[in-house]
Regions:
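GNAT-family acyltransferases
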Residues: 1-120, 145, 179-190
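Secondary-structure transition/hinge residues
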Residues: 30-34, 129, 150
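A short, internal acetyl-CoA/4′-phosphopantetheine-binding micro-motif in the GNAT/acyltransferase core
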Residues: 95, 108, 120-131, 159
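Conserved acetyl-CoA-binding loop-helix of GNAT-fold acetyltransferases
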Residues: 122-125, 131-148, 166-171
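Conserved GNAT acetyl-CoA-binding A-motif
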Residues: 146-157
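Conserved active-site alpha-helix within GNAT-family acetyltransferase domains
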Residues: 160-178
Length: 190
C-alpha cells in the first residue's frame, strides 16, 4: 500500500528541535498574506499575558523559542496562569521528522467567544505543506484526544470562504449547525 504524506505526519508535543522549521513556517504564512496564521508575529496581540510576548524577531533566539515551547505546554494545565478570557488548551504540532508542518489546538472548554467564533479545535498547516492531507490527519488525531478527555460534542468552526477547511471538517464527520459572524459552525458527536 502506498503511503501518503499524511501517513508520515505525526502529532507531537511542541519541542525546541522545531526551532528553525517553525520560523520558516512563520515566514511562509507571512509571504502568503496569512499573518493571522503566522501565530507569533506579535503574540498575544492583545498583550493580555503580562511578561509574555513572542515576535518573529525574538524567536530567533533559541532560548526565547524554548520559552515559547514551555509556555505552550503549561497552558494544558487548567490551573496555570492565564487571563480570564482564555481557557486551558492542548496544542500539538504536526511534524514529519524534525520538520514543523503546522499546529492544532484543542480548547478544553468553550467560553462565549469560542462558542460563537473559535470552537474547541483550531488548526493551521503551513502553506508549503498543504493539500497533502495533514489537516485531516491532525483533526482525526485531535478528535481522539477529545474522546480521551471526555469532550463531546466537539465544536469546530471555519471562515465562510475557507473551502479546504470546510471539507476537512465535513470529512471528519462535522454536522453543519449555522453561520455566525462569518464563521461556519460544525459539531462532531463522538
Amino acid at each position: 500500500m502506498r503511503r501518503t504524506p499524511a501517513d508520515v505526519m505525526q502529532l507531537v508535543d511542541p519541542h525546541p528541535r522545531f526551532h528553525r522549521s517553525f520560523l520558516a513556517s512563520v515566514d511562509e504564512f507571512v509571504a502568503a498574506g496569512e499573518t493571522h496564521h503566522a501565530g507569533l508575529l506579535s503574540w498575544p496581540a492583545d498583550r493580555t499575558f503580562p511578561g509574555i510576548e513572542f515576535t518573529r524577531t525574538s524567536l530567533e533566539d533559541p532560548a526565547e523559542f524554548e520559552h515559547l515551547v514551555g509556555f505552550v505546554l503549561t497552558q494544558r494545565d487548567p490551573a496555570s496562569s492565564r487571563p480570564r478570557a482564555y481557557v486551558a488548551y492542548t496544542e500539538l504540532w504536526m511534524a514529519e521528522g524534525d520538520e514543523y508542518l503546522g499546529r492544532i489546538s484543542l480548547r478544553h472548554e468553550l467560553n462565549e467567544l469560542l462558542y460563537t467564533w473559535g470552537g474547541h479545535i483550531g488548526y493551521a498547516v503551513r502553506p508549503g505543506a498543504r493539500r497533502r492531507g495533514h489537516a485531516s490527519a491532525a483533526l482525526k488525531g485531535m478528535i481522539e484526544v477529545c474522546r480521551r478527555m471526555g469532550i463531546d460534542p466537539v465544536l469546530i468552526t471555519c471562515d465562510v470562504d475557507n473551502e479546504p477547511s470546510r471539507r476537512t471538517i465535513e470529512g471528519a464527520g462535522g454536522t453543519y449547525e449555522d453561520t455566525r459572524e462569518g464563521k461556519l459552525r460544525y459539531w462532531i458527536d463522538l
